[in-house]
From Swiss-Prot:
Pfam families: UreF. The gene is ureF. GO terms for cellular component: cytoplasm. It comes from Kocuria rhizophila (strain ATCC 9341 / DSM 348 / NBRC 103217 / DC2201). This is Urease accessory protein UreF. It comes from the Bacteria. GO terms for molecular function: nickel cation binding.
Length: 234
C-alpha cells in the first residue's frame, strides 16, 4: 500500500510526464510563427520567447485556472470555470489545442485516478456540456490526488515548458543539451508564475485578470493558422 503523500506525488509524475500521450508534441503554441519570421534561431532567442510566454501567458491563464479550481466550493463552479478558461483563449488553435490535450488528459486520468469530480467532468465532456480545457482538467485531477496547490501550479507550468522545449529542440533545431539548459533556466520563471498567480489569488482578483495575455503572443498564435508550411498544429 502506497502512502497517501507518495501516491499523490507518483500520480503527479505520471500525469505531467512529457511522454503522456496528450498530443503536446504537436504544438508550438505560437513559437513556430516566430521561427518562420527567423526570430527564433538559437538558445537565446527561444529562451527569451519562452520566458515571455510563461510570464505573460501561462501565468495569467493556466496557472490562475488551476488555482481557481482549487478554490471551487462545488463542481458547478468547475463547470463555469471550464467554459470561462476555454473562452478566454482567443486564438482558435490555442483554444482547440487546450481542449484536445485536456480531453486526452482527462481520459487517462479518469482511468488511473477516478474520483467524483473526475467522473462528473468526464461525463460532462462526453455529453458535450463541458469543453475539457487542460488547465481545469489538471486542477481537478491534482486536487483529487491531494497535491498541494503551489505544487499543482508549478508542475503544470513546468510540464508545458518541458514540452515546448522538446518541440523546439527538433523544430528550430536546438541540441539536446541546449534544451536541458533551457529547462533548467526555466525553473526561475516557473517559480515566478507560482508566486504571481498566488498573489493574484490571495488578492481576490484571479478571475478578473484571467486571460490578460500580451497581444503580441496572441497575434502570433492567430497568424500561425495562415502559415503556408507548418511543423506544428499550433
Amino acid at each position: 500500500m502506497v502512502e497517501p503523500s507518495l501516491a499523490g506525488l507518483l500520480g503527479l509524475m505520471q500525469l505531467t510526464d512529457s511522454a503522456l500521450p496528450t498530443g503536446a508534441f504537436s504544438h508550438s503554441l505560437g513559437f513556430e510563427t516566430y521561427m518562420a519570421a527567423e526570430q527564433l534561431e538559437d538558445r537565446e532567442s527561444f529562451s527569451a520567447w519562452l520566458e515571455m510566454f510563461v510570464d505573460q501567458q501561462l501565468t495569467h491563464t493556466d496557472a490562475l485556472a488551476v488555482r481557481l479550481v482549487y478554490a471551487a466550493g462545488d463542481f458547478e463552479r468547475v463547470e463555469d470555470l471550464d467554459e470561462l478558461v476555454t473562452a478566454q483563449a482567443l486564438p482558435r488553435q490555442i483554444r482547440e489545442g487546450g481542449t484536445t490535450m485536456g480531453r486526452r488528459l482527462l481520459s487517462i486520468g479518469a482511468r488511473s485516478y477516478p474520483g467524483e469530480w473526475v467522473r462528473r467532468y468526464q461525463q460532462g465532456v462526453e455529453e458535450e456540456r463541458l469543453r475539457g480545457h487542460q488547465a481545469t482538467v489538471w486542477g481537478v485531477l491534482a486536487r483529487g490526488l491531494d497535491v498541494p496547490e503551489d505544487t499543482a501550479v508549478a508542475s503544470h507550468v513546468y510540464a508545458a515548458v518541458i514540452s515546448l522545449t522538446q518541440n523546439a529542440v527538433r523544430g528550430i533545431p536546438l541540441g539536446q543539451n541546449t534544451g536541458q539548459a533551457v529547462i533548467r533556466a526555466a525553473q526561475e520563471w516557473v517559480g515566478r508564475a507560482v508566486a504571481t498567480s498566488r498573489r493574484l489569488s490571495e488578492e481576490g482578483i484571479a478571475e478578473e485578470v484571467l486571460g490578460a495575455v500580451a497581444p503580441g503572443l496572441e497575434i502570433a498564435q492567430m497568424n500561425h493558422e495562415r502559415q503556408r508550411a507548418r511543423l506544428f498544429m499550433s
